[in-house]
């Protein structure tokens, strides 16, 4: 959620930066509500001060007959104060609701643009493989090796689901364990295993609600949501808490299944594992001091990249433009892995700095000194990595002419020493 005071004091800047996300931004409703709030608050506080002053005078007067007029007037003042406070509560609620629908302000260094075409490539790593045969897509490879079954998954649940079988299931599990071991061992993240269902306050804290409720899988009774990413429960671990300055940055790594409707993806990626209703992901979440969050984002990005470097999968890093970053993000770097079967790079991780946007919604603060005033932390997260898409990249980049798939060396200890998957 945006800082009310910042929007008020830097209105033109806020409007201009929001406009770079694409489309016209009309903040007139905000100015109207904020002006009404300040008017109501001023009148209410003035009447309360007057009431206190007159009440003190009445209390000192022994002969109450001399102040009957003031007593009667104070009754009217009390009624008016109640009316003002009730309207103020309504206006503040409307103002908060409006702020909840506004996206984050893009970072000052975020490239300005309207779509993914305006994203800026930062760097590439690894060598794109060249085959002496026609590269196959992962769905063909997986079905031929009998390690992926989309047809039977469709029978069980419908489109955008998959069954992993045999070496396919083991490879998925190996990737999860490899990623968690890397992040918790070498990168020093603390492992978290959170709930897969959360309440409305939790979804609101990270920005999924109220704007994106239609994109979420919802349970009516009780009122729970299936998580679209571990970012949601893990960030909310410290909702309504004050962290100690000495504990920052706090770094968590969590493996969870994720659940998404993909309502806006009709007709896109209808085959394979790229866009699923249910998929596995290892998520990295950080809580940092405001002045250190930009640097922490680069560290998080490098931690995610290291997974691909260890697996020797070619990738590139892209700095997302203002028109392509997510609702809650101020700055986002995408990692895109090369997929020979599609002859293109595809997103495998998004690493974002949300600054204090989520922390303000979720009331996550820290205290620099024992008796210092609490400040909002900055929150960050990124995929480290999307497991299914990593499996896709392995199948396509390590495919052999005879139809087999070589297991990356880094994964072989997690595969019981298996070096190749063959039919």
Curated annotation (Swiss-Prot):
One of its GO terms (molecular function) is ATP binding. It is an enzyme of class 6 (ligase). It holds the Pfam family Seryl_tRNA_N. It catalyses: tRNA(Ser) + L-serine + ATP = L-seryl-tRNA(Ser) + AMP + diphosphate + H(+); tRNA(Sec) + L-serine + ATP = L-seryl-tRNA(Sec) + AMP + diphosphate + H(+). GO terms for biological process: selenocysteine biosynthetic process; seryl-tRNA aminoacylation. Its EC number is 6.1.1.11. ATP binds at residues 260-262, 347-350. Belongs to the class-II aminoacyl-tRNA synthetase family. Type-1 seryl-tRNA synthetase subfamily. Catalyzes the attachment of serine to tRNA(Ser). Is also able to aminoacylate tRNA(Sec) with serine, to form the misacylated tRNA L-seryl-tRNA(Sec), which will be further converted into selenocysteinyl-tRNA(Sec). Homodimer. The tRNA molecule binds across the dimer. This is Serine--tRNA ligase. The gene is serS.
